[in-house]
Amino acid sequence: MKLLLLSMGLALVCGLQPECSRSEEDLSDEKERKWEQLSRHWHTVVLASSDRSLIEEEGPFRNFIQNITVESGNLNGFFLTRKNGQCIPLYLTAFKTEEARQFKLNYYGTNDVYYGSSKPNEYAKFIFYNYHDGKVNVVANLFGRTPNLSNEIKKRFEEDFMNRGFRRENILDISEVDHC
C-alpha cells in the first residue's frame, strides 16, 4: 500500500513537471535558447558593491557593457572601461558551471557570477562574488536594453541589495554617466 501511494505521488509530481519525461539533451537545448535571449546590446544602468572603490570611476568593476553573446553556454561580454582617462575595450568570458545560473570568471581575481533575474527584452541582473587578495566582495550589475530603465526597476534593484546589507552609498545609478 505504501509503495502504491509513493508511486502515485511520484506520477503526480512528474505529471506537473513535464521535464521528468524529457531527455537531458532536450533540456540542454531549452536552456541554451533561454541564455541566447541575453545576446545583443546592453547598457550598464546601476552598480552596487560591498566595497564602493570597486565601482567608483576607474575602479575595476566600473565597466560599461556593450554586448553579450552566448556560445556553448558561456557568456561573452564586451565592455568599455576607463583607464587613465581613456576608454579601452575589455572582453570577458564567464564560463558555465554545473550549477544553474552560475558562471566562473577570471577577472580581478576570481569570481563566482550568478545570473539574478531578468526580463530579457528589458533588463538583466548579475551578482559577482569577487575573490581578490584574500578578500571577498560582492558586486552587482543591473543592465538595461536601453540606457534608462524605469525608476520602478531601479528601485527594486536598490531595495534588493539594501536588504542584503548594502549601504545606499554603495549603490550607484550610472545611467546618466559618460559611458565612453
Curated annotation (Swiss-Prot):
Species: Trichosurus vulpecula
Protein name, UniProt field: Trichosurin
Domain of life, per lineage: Eukaryota
Residue ranges crossing the lipid bilayer per the database entry: none
Subunit and interaction comment: Homodimer.
SUPFAM superfamilies from the UniProt entry: Lipocalins
Lineage, highest ranks first: Eukaryota, Metazoa, Chordata, Craniata, Vertebrata
Subcellular location: Secreted
Disulfide bond entries: C87-C180
GO molecular function: small molecule binding
InterPro entries cross-referenced by the UniProt entry: Calycin, Lipocalin, Lipocln_cytosolic_FA-bd_dom, Maj_urinary
